[in-house]
């Protein structure tokens, strides 16, 4: 038997080690479940890490109420089929105040419905460690963040005060009220994620596959018309195009890409040829200079 691990096997082993380390060291961990491809891989790894037992922590979805309908359907189906403990948290104050990406802009909307919503949930359930599916190849602020990312009592991240991580050793010490965000997929690339999904036959939201969908061209992006809340601006018209999504978020803030890739091998082929970041389709990354780093410093994932 060949004892050499493949590249994907090495990544899998590292991620499973990280997940088990968190469960061993923290009293009340949780896994953030955003329903995207990275969350799908992370959940698959967690199930592998503790098989045949279920993962010994719940899933948490911070619901902004603006996710694609197919994402919510997929979330509920996966939780039911896998017998998972799923916590869904909504910032009810934001809903009461009518906060939306259309009327308040992406920066304020993201802060209220995502960042504050996440902090509310972490405080409510007193989680001391939270898994997230962020990867270093996605965006420059994530590239410099540690795998075990320390957060102070108000959930803020200080990029100038990060703990060293040498020889795969992680400092898990925290004081009451402090917490750690943990990123088991830090060293994975977008291509790694797709190849692993193909290899392991991991279920993903159908929006990742190309299909003819109703879209409008807005600010240089193709925004899918997912429900009646999307109001057309003067001069806009609904078009039907073959599109898919490289990244998934709130539908008014997530751009589709024109594509005919409706199978995993075709998506992987696209990844081998593309020269653009998957997050170019996320409006929240571009609503201000240093946008993602500022959001993370305020408590965003």
Curated annotation (Swiss-Prot):
A biological process term (GO) from this entry: hydrogen sulfide biosynthetic process
The protein's annotated pathway: Sulfur metabolism; hydrogen sulfide biosynthesis; sulfite from sulfate: step 1/3
Cross-referenced HAMAP family: Sulf_adenylyltr_sub2
Gene behind the chain: cysD
Catalytic function, reaction form: sulfate + ATP + H(+) = adenosine 5'-phosphosulfate + diphosphate
Species whose genome carries this gene: Geotalea uraniireducens (strain Rf4)
Keywords, comma-separated and alphabetical: ATP-binding, Nucleotide-binding, Nucleotidyltransferase, Transferase
Protein name, entry field: Sulfate adenylyltransferase subunit 2
SUBUNIT field: Heterodimer composed of CysD, the smaller subunit, and CysN.
Family of this protein: Belongs to the PAPS reductase family. CysD subfamily.
Enzyme Commission code(s) on record: 2.7.7.4
